[in-house]
Curated annotation (Swiss-Prot):
Belongs to the bacterial ribosomal protein bL9 family. The keyword Chaperone does not apply. Coiled coil: none annotated. Binds to the 23S rRNA. One of its GO terms (cellular component) is ribosome. InterPro entries: Ribosomal_bL9 (IPR000244), Ribosomal_bL9/RNase_H1_N (IPR009027), Ribosomal_bL9_bac/chp (IPR020594), Ribosomal_bL9_C (IPR020069), Ribosomal_bL9_C_sf (IPR036791), Ribosomal_bL9_N (IPR020070), Ribosomal_bL9_N_sf (IPR036935). HAMAP family: Ribosomal_bL9. GO terms for molecular function: rRNA binding; structural constituent of ribosome. Keywords: Ribonucleoprotein, Ribosomal protein, RNA-binding, rRNA-binding. This is Large ribosomal subunit protein bL9. GO terms for biological process: translation.
Amino acid sequence: MDLILLQKVTNLGNLGDKVSVKPGYGRNFLVPQGKAVPATAANVEAFETKRAEYEAKANSILAEAQSRATKFEGASVTIGAHASTEGKLYGSVGPRDIAEAFTAAGLPLEKSEVILGEGAFRNVGEYDVVLHLHADVETTVKVIVESDA
């Protein structure tokens, strides 16, 4: 399935690129999310006439993500969880918990923006967490998991 990208998509291409993807990926994800349109002759022509508008929109989204990244620089959050005396949690701290903690601290964050490379945290301690705010913008924050018992 051939598509025209309306914004940068990680590991696929940039704004305006004509890409070929599997039909399910295009039909079920890229097109409904507004990230691409089918590469028909009419859509190619319409894209070229609105190219400046799409580029301006992409630049504003990137600028917003960069401003959010500066707010997260040096930020940390403490999350309390039930833990044993050895520091092993009776559960785990995952992306949803981290996103909720930052949102409660006044820094809105979606759980899909939290990247945990090695899975959820299962022990008490300090962790560096990568936030993927945009295809070109990532920042690192500190998450402290404490025992609340």
